[in-house]
């Protein structure tokens, strides 16, 4: 039925308040959503105290249910409060075990039991079969969660990453929950102009007291679906009309199956090692399969690297860490040789990607965005009161679309090799380690911040070893005397200043990862708006 109230008068001109600047919108356009930017003013010479900084950090994509949502627990009822709501599949799914169901996009289900959280017992109305289905692959029939364009809890920066992915035309759009206003939504649209090139505009969708929705009060709608239909037919004040929903990509599963959710020590025979991806000091990394049908990464540890008992204890904590910028731990084989089974990232380590892969051609905006993703994952680790202890580009993995995820968090504490535990031994990563951690074993989230500063140098130098020309002993001595790496070639001074603040001698003076995430996400609007690509960066 369309527009509840839709006046044909010109849309009121609103100022576009975006990324700290005010620009008058042209023509008949609405102003884009003035999402507040959570950074202090950043000058070249002085940086404020970061540690009291609070930002609304963006979370990963949770379409419906899954680990970031509590909306799918308990009894499932229809709007009238009786009976059972039907759910519809948003994606195809291939069964991994005899307990779960294969299904196709569009298939409808009756939910029999939703108490397992991420896995629901369901009956397919197409086949009549009963089994478990991943809860984030389905949504209630006719709900906004079932719409192609609805992305749920997706942060502003992640919305921009998805919309700016290669191949999306101007007018690609999505709707997500507002980060700043409870009950409201944001419409994010890919746009293009001569000045900015490809970019994303965000519009706040506000809710009326009677349940309707509007971007401007001149055009009000009973449902979000009607709003989308209206702006798909005409721009009507937006930057352009809505052309096509953004591609969602498959949701991430945090378990291999419903059985491994709680019992995730698995038999070695269920794993097949297919292709060796890397060989390190303490073991190898393989691409393989679980159960013959699910692609995984398998880290095999040399016997004696760590105590199986200590590893299993730490793995209990690691399994509970769930964030879209952390490599998900799926399962373990806890008898030696220990196997660690995680999600597979097809581009390998960030270090190899920068030195020998596609990363060699990347310019500063991509590199800063990758750093922002790492900071987002570390901000989650910070919130969870956990510590990584070995943050460097070799322990960051890369996937399609320059997606970065943190791997091997927490494992360094368990290593029993004397060449490592001595901290000045040959296998210990001195060049990435904060002095208080290297000298006195004081590992904290603030020593991780130091390591992040070193990782920033790896990014802008495309994988160069830190402190070139210096050995570990020299690095330790020089850093204790106050030496810090100079600004790398072509690196903006403002980014080097951020590194220097990560390398403050007093750990408490170093920034939080929450601040680092926000600063890097808004770097090219708040700090370096005049950036022009150079030969290297």
UniProtKB/Swiss-Prot annotation:
The active site is at 390 (proton acceptor). Its cofactor is Mn(2+). PROSITE patterns: PROTEIN_KINASE_ATP (PS00107), PROTEIN_KINASE_DOM (PS50011), PROTEIN_KINASE_TYR (PS00109), SH2 (PS50001), SH3 (PS50002). GO terms for biological process: activated T cell proliferation; adaptive immune response; axon guidance; calcium ion transport; cell differentiation; cell surface receptor protein tyrosine kinase signaling pathway; cellular response to amyloid-beta; cellular response to glycine. Keywords: Adaptive immunity, ATP-binding, Cell membrane, Cytoplasm, Developmental protein, Host-virus interaction, Immunity, Kinase, Lipoprotein, Manganese, Membrane, Metal-binding, Myristate, Nucleotide-binding, Nucleus, Palmitate, Phosphoprotein, Proto-oncogene, SH2 domain, SH3 domain, Transferase, Tyrosine-protein kinase. It is an enzyme of class 2 (transferase). It is found in: Cytoplasm; Nucleus; Cell membrane; Perikaryon. It comes from the Eukaryota. A lipid is attached at residue 2 (N-myristoyl glycine). Its EC number is 2.7.10.2. Belongs to the protein kinase superfamily. Tyr protein kinase family. SRC subfamily. Non-receptor tyrosine-protein kinase that plays a role in many biological processes including regulation of cell growth and survival, cell adhesion, integrin-mediated signaling, cytoskeletal remodeling, cell motility, immune response and axon guidance. Inactive FYN is phosphorylated on its C-terminal tail within the catalytic domain. Following activation by PKA, the protein subsequently associates with PTK2/FAK1, allowing PTK2/FAK1 phosphorylation, activation and targeting to focal adhesions. This is Tyrosine-protein kinase Fyn.
């Amino acid at each position: 039925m369309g527009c509840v109230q839709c006046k044909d008068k010109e849309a009121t001109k609103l100022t576009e308040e975006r990324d700290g600047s005010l620009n008058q919108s042209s023509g008949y356009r609405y102003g884009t959503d003035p999402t507040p930017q959570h950074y202090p003013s950043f000058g070249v010479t002085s940086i404020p105290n970061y540690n009291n900084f609070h930002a609304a950090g963006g979370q990963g994509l949770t379409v419906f249910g899954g680990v970031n949502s509590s909306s799918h627990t308990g009894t499932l009822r229809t709007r009238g409060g009786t009976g059972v709501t039907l759910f519809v599949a948003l994606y195809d799914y291939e069964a991994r075990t005899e307990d779960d169901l294969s299904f196709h996009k569009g298939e409808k289900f009756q939910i029999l039991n939703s108490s397992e959280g991420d896995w629901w017992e369901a009956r397919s109305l197409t086949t009549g079969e009963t089994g478990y289905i991943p809860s984030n692959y389905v949504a209630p029939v006719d709900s906004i969660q079932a719409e192609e364009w609805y992305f749920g809890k997706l942060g502003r920066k992640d919305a921009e990453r998805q919309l700016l992915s290669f191949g999306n035309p101007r007018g690609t759009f999505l709707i997500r929950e507002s980060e700043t206003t409870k009950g409201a939504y944001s419409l994010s649209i890919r746009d293009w102009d001569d000045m900015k090139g490809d970019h994303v505009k965000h519009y706040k969708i506000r809710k009326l007291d009677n349940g309707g929705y509007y971007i401007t009060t001149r055009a009000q709608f009973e449902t979000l679906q009607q709003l989308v239909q209206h702006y798909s037919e005409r721009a009507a004040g937006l930057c352009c009309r809505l052309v096509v929903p953004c591609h969602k990509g498959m949701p991430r599963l945090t378990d291999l199956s419903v059985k491994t959710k709680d019992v995730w020590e698995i038999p070695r025979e269920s794993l097949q090692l297919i292709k060796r991806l890397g060989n390190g000091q303490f073991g190898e990394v393989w691409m393989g399969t679980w159960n013959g049908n699910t692609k995984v990464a398998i880290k095999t540890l040399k016997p004696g690297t760590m105590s199986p008992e200590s590893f299993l204890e730490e793995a209990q904590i690691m399994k509970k860490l769930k964030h879209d910028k952390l490599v998900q731990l799926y399962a373990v084989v806890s008898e030696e040789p220990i196997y660690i089974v995680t999600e597979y990232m097809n581009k390998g380590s960030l270090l190899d990607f920068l030195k020998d892969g596609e990363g060699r051609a990347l310019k500063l905006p991509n590199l800063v965005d990758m750093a922002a993703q790492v900071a987002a994952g570390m901000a989650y680790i910070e919130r969870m009161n956990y510590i990584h202890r070995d943050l460097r580009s070799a322990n960051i993995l890369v996937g399609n679309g320059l997606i970065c995820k943190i791997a091997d968090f927490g494992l360094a504490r368990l290593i029993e090799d004397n060449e490592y535990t001595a901290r000045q031994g040959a296998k210990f990563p001195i060049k990435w380690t904060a002095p208080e951690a290297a000298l006195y074993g004081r590992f904290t989230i603030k020593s991780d911040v130091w390591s992040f500063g070193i990782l920033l140098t790896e990014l802008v130098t495309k994988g160069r070893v830190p402190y070139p020309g210096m050995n570990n002993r020299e690095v330790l001595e020089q850093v204790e005397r106050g030496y810090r790496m100079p600004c790398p070639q072509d690196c903006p001074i403002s980014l080097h200043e951020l590194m220097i603040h990560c390398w403050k001698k007093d750990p408490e003076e170093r920034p939080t990862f929450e601040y680092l995430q926000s600063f890097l996400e808004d770097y090219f609007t708040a700090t370096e708006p005049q950036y022009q690509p150079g030969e290297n960066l």
